[in-house]
Structure formats: C-alpha cells, structure tokens
Swiss-Prot record:
Pfam families linked: Meth_synt_1 (PF08267), Meth_synt_2 (PF01717)
GO MF entries: 5-methyltetrahydropteroyltriglutamate-homocysteine S-methyltransferase activity; zinc ion binding
GO biological process: methionine biosynthetic process; methylation
NCBIfam families: met_syn_B12ind, PRK05222.1
Protein name: 5-methyltetrahydropteroyltriglutamate--homocysteine methyltransferase
Cofactor annotation comment: Binds 1 zinc ion per subunit.
Organism (species): Cupriavidus necator (strain ATCC 17699 / DSM 428 / KCTC 22496 / NCIMB 10442 / H16 / Stanier 337)
Binding site for L-homocysteine: I432, G433, S434, E485, D600
Residues at the catalytic site: H695
Gene3D superfamilies referenced in this protein's UniProt entry, alphabetically: 3.20.20.210
Enzyme class: transferase
PANTHER family the UniProt entry points to: 5-METHYLTETRAHYDROPTEROYLTRIGLUTAMATE--HOMOCYSTEINE METHYLTRANSFERASE
Residues the entry annotates as binding 5-methyltetrahydropteroyltri-L-glutamate: R16, E17, L18, K19, K112, R516, C517, W562, E606
Length: 792
C-alpha cells in the first residue's frame, strides 16, 4: 500500500487569518492568548483537511508565527545574543522582535529561501552560540495533533541545511565547527518526540541539492550518524532540484527514508531507485508544490506504477515540496472564469489530487474514475483552448532573429548620440520611478476599481498627481524626471492586467514573509500586448516639462519571476513572449517622444538555478529576453535598467551583456562595496549607484551622500556616473522624500563644482577621505521589498 503525506501546508489561512491576527497583535488590538487561539484553529483546520483525504500522517511543526527558520532557531535556543533574550522564556512579543527589530536592535537579516519567493530569517552564529533549547511550541503542536487522534509527523529543517543557511559576522568563523553542539540540540528534540510515541520525523535537507564542498558533504555523514542514536524514524527530504549525484552517498546514511522532487528533477528517479537500501522508503514528490496547475494524474500514475511494483509498501507519495508556496484554496475564487479555474489546483485541491493518486495505486483506477476523468478533461481543455496558444504570437516568435536582440550601434557610439540629444550635466540626477503612494492615491484607485468614479474622473485625478510629481521634481532640480506611477498598484500586476495571456485571482495569496502576503498573477497562455499600456501617461507627463521624462516598464524576467507561470512550455519561451510585448511598448514610447526608457529587472538574479552548472543556460535566455525587449529603438534613445539589492559580482558578465545604456543599483547599505565589483570588472556602460537607502525614513545629509559619491568616483569615472536613490520611493512620505532628494541634488552639484574647479576629466581624490556613514550589512540575492509591492 503506497502511503500519502505532505511536506507542509500554508500557514496563513484561506482568508489570511494569521496575517490579520499577527497585525492586530502588533497593534495591541489582540492579546497573545488570542493570537495563539487563531493559530491553533488554523492548525486544526489544516490537519483535518489532510486527515479527511486519508493521508497516512499529518505534518506538524510546519506552522510558524513568522518563519520556520526563526522558529527552529528559537526551539534550539540559538537566539542572537545581541537581543539579550532567554530562549526558555521566550514570549511571542520577543519572538516578533527578532523578526522585526526593536528600539535597541535591528531585525535579523532576511533573505530568500533557496530559489523561491519566500523569505526566511537568517540565524546569527559564532563560537559562543549554544543550542540548549527554547520554548516548547514545537512539541505542543505535536501534542495537539496527537490529542486529536491523528498520526503526527513533525517536520524539522535538517542540521546541515540549518548551518548552511546561517551566517556568522565573525570573519573566518567556520559554521561547521558548531555541528557537534548543534547535533546535541537536535538529539534532545528527537528524544522528546520519541517520548511522545512519534513514529516518523521529516528532516528537510534541501542543501543536498546544492553544489557542496567536501566538508559539507562530510557533515551529512557526521550528522546522521549522531541522530540515528535518537528515537523516531527519519525521512530525509530533498526538494527544489536534483540530488541524484549524491544519491549513493545519501543512501548510505542511517535514515529510514528519502523524499525527492520529481517535478523539478524527474530524471533523478532512476538513480535513487538504484541506490535505495532494501529497508528504506522512497517518497516521490509528484505534485507541484510551487505552481498552481492541476496535475495530469494519468501521466503521474504511469510513472508511479512501475515504482510501486518494485517498492510496494516502501513507496510514499507527496507534493514536490511544502505547499507553503501556493495559495490555500480555490473555494473563494468566485470571480475567476470557469475555464481558467478548472485548470488550477491550490493547496487544498492538491490534497485531493494526492488522495486520488494514493487510492488509484492502492485500490485501482475504477475507485477514482470520476476524479481521473475530471483530470483528463482539465488537461484536454488546456491543450485545446484558443486562449492558451495564439497563432500570431507563435508566428512572431518564429520570426525573431538574433539581430533583433542587438542595438544598432555599440555603446561607445550610442552614448555620444544620447549625450547630444539629452544635453545632461555631469553626474545627472534622477529617481528610480515611483513616488509616495499617498492615501488619496490609494483611495482614488480603490474608488475606480469599485466603480464609484468613472474613467474620466479617474484619469483627471491621476493626471493631477502626475503634475504634482513633475512640479516637485523640477523644483528640486532633478535632471531626468519620472511621472511617479500614481496609477500603478504593483509593478507586475499593472502590466499583467493589460497583457493577454494573464489572469488574476481574488484570494490567491501566498506568504512572502511574516504577515506579508503576495498575490502573484497567473500566466496561462501566450502573452501579447493588444494595445499601448503606458504611452498616453508618459506623453502627458512629458508635456509638462522640457526635461527628459523616463518611460517606466517592468522587464520580462521580473514579470516571469513574480508570476505563477504556465508549465506547458519552457520558461524561456514565455520570457521571449513577454520581451516582445515590452519591445512593442518601448518602441511606441520612443515614437511618442520619450527619450529615456527604463526597463526594471530587479528579479534577474532571483531566477538563477540552484546549481552553477545550470547558470549559463538561464542567463543566456534571460539576457536575450531583456535585449530583445530593449533593442528596437534608435541610438539616441537611452535605455535604463534597475536592479535591487543583490550580489552582482558572480553575474557581472551577464549584466554587461544586457547592454543597457545605464544601470541603477542599490548600493547605499553596503557603503558602495557592491559597486567595487563593477569597477574590478571594468563595467563598460553608465551606472547609477544608489546614494541613499529608501527603506529608512532617515534623511541623509548632503555630506553623507557626497562621501558615497566620492567613493563611487574611485570606482567609476565621473563621466559614466549617475546620481539616484537606491530604489523607488513608493513606500516613503513626501516630506522625507523631498528633503532627501534635495540633499541628493545638492551633493551632486557640489561634486560637479569640485570637478569643474579642478578641471578634472578623470577622477582623483578631491578631498580627504571620510568613512561613509552607511553601515555595510550582509546582502543576499534578492529584490528589495520596495520593488515587490504586490504584497498585502
């Protein structure tokens, strides 16, 4: 009999109950007891969903009040010492302070969970870190499930993955030195679970899918030799990529079963079947835990039946990874059109699919004939739908030539024509795109969406906001202006709503971090642009000023990364379709007299595969997509791109290959350290390193920004340097925005004056160096949360 289980379930609730309870607690409108009660209700509901569908075990420990890595850090007692907290007496208020900061301490660092759009809190480790235990929440959740008569299977992030994802701020400290002490903490956890009669514990080790050095591979041997002496059976779970090259070594570990991801890496099945010990179970992740499309159940059954014949009761079935990454339920999607809805499966529907697969294998197809027929019908509907495949889009894709991804002239020639056309000063000043989204702007958009105001009144209100933004920029003395994006709710959804091939859910929320949830749009079919999207707005904004006005677009890779993407064609193909749609908009903006066009790609690095061997293939099609979107214009039209806070050094050749005339990047929090890689690489085009942090309400001084510009000029010649904030200003208020931009313009003018006075054509230090005031902080490969504004 094949067993069924899941690796984890979304914790937010089908109506985002956890989010609203968290935020009420933070405001002081709910007590800790009331928040705990909401959490307990959600856990019971989610366990019952699993039990009602006949799953053999229910996942416990997958719940977290903020983040599972933070909860594990608390469970182990490894809290950052700078907070001065007693792990054994940790309250929820203190737990949230670790994630959100307090008056004395900034929050723990947050970064992406592997290559997903979920964020985790990074443990802070050093030689004095201890793992003596913390609050009993993890065990209490297992007790809750057991008290309900359920077979609980607690879920833990494994010790090697935990160390791999941690950081130390002590130079040269080897995190693996903590492994012996960490394993003692894990053994105490497993001992307590054994005492409760727990049969199986799931230990997640997705790090086994990464490029690991020998010392880290050896750590698996050490870790599981130690944990074998503890009680419950261990299911070692891998996901997000293949672990086939480590299958032989992993199979020798003293564990009782393995989970592998057959959605991301179906080719690894043979290697694991060959390596699997005779006693071990093999859990196959056959339902996509990261996307929202219904599973082709008959195709999966064709894969599973030979495995069942070989393994019998040692075969387990599961989603590919935790269902954390998909919305909770389709039940509340009342406005989604019937056809598109029939193609989708959220977390609850994926439980149904899993149940059908288990029953088909164990009892025969006849028992689930109706469900299999519905699956067949959904697959046939997608294949046949005229909404999915558009002949004109296919013809246009086939006609794309290599030359379409190239500008007419090399950068050295283009930039001279652009300088003549734009007549900008040395160190031109600009912003990244968005300006403060005031309550009035949000109310206007909401009123229009609800039908309370008509299209004409909406347009008049938005144009009034644009006029305000233009006047403020001119008064500040900025050189290249933006319209402020008052009409945009989100940098992906705004464009997706105007592109064919996109759909939108009402309640398709997934957790990004903490209480922040995102509702990604759905790319279900061939993408194309039926009509211009931003041209009228840009033309109006340009009519208000003689200074250059930037057209503002979201790039094809960011549109791809921040959506649920169709799974019936390669992502590279969808990226090319997006690129052609954006290319049309770029060309129309140029025809409308827009001389500077920005194509934002904050998510470019996020798309990198987990293994470096796969990077080149991804970067090739991703860069080509950007170039295809940007290369239809004349030489004198200047193309900008923006990338958020990320580690760029290892992909600088790809960034240079994008061939944007100007790239703006987020650098102020690293005190311009991120810029040094561009200098070492001799980045050939123009660059605008951010000179102040838009995530903070603090207004930096003129002198502080001058110091950052001085440092930037040591890396990039002033003739190729732009002056701008780190990112868009949507989340800030006008008072702080105007003050900060005024200081930024003053800093640029002061540096211009110093350069002019010295007659400098190349940079030499013009003043005694002073330490930059922006403190360097660790950075990760993420777009900043200011860009990911489709959240709530």
């Amino acid at each position: 009999m094949a067993r069924t289980h899941i690796l984890g379930f979304p914790r937010i609730g089908e109506r985002r109950e956890l989010k609203f309870a968290q935020e009420a607690f933070w405001r002081g409108d709910r007590t800790e007891a009331e928040l705990r009660d909401v959490a307990a209700q959600l856990r019971r509901r989610h366990w019952q969903l699993q039990a009602d569908r006949g799953l053999d075990t229910v996942a416990t420990g997958d719940f977290a009040y903020y983040d599972q890595m933070l909860s594990l850090t608390a469970l182990l007692g490894a809290l950052p010492r700078r907070f001065g907290l007693d792990p054994a007496r940790l309250t929820l208020t203190q737990y949230f302070e670790l994630a959100r900061g307090n008056r004395e301490q900034p929050a723990m660092e947050m970064t992406k969970w592997f290559d997903t759009n979920y964020h985790y809190l990074v443990p802070e480790l050093d030689a004095e870190t201890t793992f003596d235990g913390g609050p009993a929440w993890f065990f209490e959740e297992a007790d809750e499930a057991l008290a309900l008569g359920l077979r609980a299977r607690p879920v833990l992030i494994g010790p090697v993955t935990y160390l791999w994802l941690s950081k130390s701020h002590v130079a040269g400290f080897d995190r693996l030195a903590l492994l012996p002490q960490l394993l003692q903490g894990y053994r105490r956890i497993l001992d307590q679970l054994k005492a409760r009669g727990i049969e199986w514990v799931q230990i997640d080790e997705p790090a086994l899918c990464l490029d690991l050095e020998p010392a880290w591979l050896d750590a698996f041997d050490t870790a599981y030799a130690a944990l074998r002496e503890a009680g419950p059976k261990l299911l070692l779970a891998t996901y997000f990529d293949t672990a086939a090259d480590h299958a032989q070594r992993a199979a020798a570990l003293p564990v009782d079963g393995f989970h592998i991801d057959l959605v991301r890496a179906p080719e690894q099945l043979a290697a694991w079947q060959a390596a699997l010990p005779a006693h071990a179970v093999l859990s196959l992740g056959v339902i996509d835990g990261r996307n929202i499309w219904r599973t082709d159940l008959r195709r999966v059954l064709d894969t599973l039946r030979p495995v069942q014949a070989a393994l019998g009761e040692r075969l387990w079935l599961a989603p590919s990874c935790s269902l954390l990454h998909v919305p909770v339920s389709l039940a509340h999607e009342v406005r989604l059109d019937v056809e598109l809805k029939s193609w989708l499966a959220f977390a609850t529907e994926k439980l149904d699919e899993l149940s059908v697969l288990g029953r088909a294998l164990n009892q025969g197809d006849a028992v689930v004939a109706e469900a299999l027929a519905a699956s067949d019908a959904a697959q046939a509907s997608r294949r046949a739908s005229r909404r999915v495949v558009n002949p004109r889009v296919q013809q246009r894709l086939a006609a794309v030539s290599a030359g379409m991804a190239d500008r007419a002239s090399p950068f050295a020639e283009r930039i001279e024509r652009q300088r003549q056309a734009l007549q900008l000063p040395l160190l031109p000043t600009t912003t990244i795109g968005s300006f403060p989204q005031t309550a009035a702007i949000r109310q206007t958009r909401a009123a229009f969406k609800r039908g309370e105001i008509g299209a004409l009144e909406y347009l008049e209100r938005i144009r009034a906001e644009i006029a305000v933004a233009v006047r403020k920029q001119e008064a500040l003395g900025l050189d290249v202006l933006v319209h402020g994006e008052a009409e945009r709710n989100d940098m992906v959804e705004y464009f997706g709503e105007q592109l064919c091939g996109y759909g939108f859910t009402e309640n398709g929320w997934v957790q990004s971090y903490g209480s922040r949830c995102v509702k990604p749009p759905v790319i279900y079919g061939d993408v194309y642009r039926p009509e211009p999207m931003t041209v009228d707005t840009a033309r109006y904004a340009q009519s208000l000023t003689e200074r250059p006005m930037k057209g503002m677009l979201t790039g094809p890779i960011t549109m791809l990364q921040w959506s649920f993407v169709r799974d019936d064609q390669p992502r590279a193909t969808t990226a090319r379709q997006l690129a052609l749609a954006i290319r049309d908009e770029v060309c129309d903006l140029e025809q409308a007299g827009i001389r500077v066009i920005q194509i934002d790609e904050p998510a470019l690095r996020e798309g990198l595969p987990l293994r470096r061997a796969d990077w080149d293939a991804y970067l090739d099609w991703a860069v080509t997509a950007f170039r295809l979107s940007a290369s239809g214009v004349q030489d004198q039209t200047q193309i900008h791109t923006h990338m958020c806070y990320a580690e760029f050094n290892d992909i600088l050749p790809a960034i240079a290959a994008m061939d944007a005339d100007v790239i703006t990047i987020e650098t102020s929090r690293s005190a311009m350290e991120l810029l040094e890689g561009f200098g070492d690489f001799d980045y050939p085009n123009e660059i605008g390193p951010g000179v102040y942090d838009i995530h903070s309400p603090r207004v930096p001084s003129v002198q502080a920004m001058e110091r950052l510009l001085d440092r930037a000029c040591e890396v990039v010649p002033p003739q190729r340097l732009w002056v701008n904030p780190d990112c868009g200003l949507k989340t800030r208020g006008w008072e702080e925005t105007e003050a900060a931009l005024a200081n930024m313009v003053s800093a640029a003018r002061a540096l211009r004056a110093r350069l002019s006075a010295r007659g400098a054509t190349t940079w030499k230090r013009l003043s005694k160096p002073a330490a930059a005031t922006a403190a360097a902080v660790p950075h990760a490969g993420n777009a900043c949360t200011a860009c990911a504004t489709h959240a709530n």
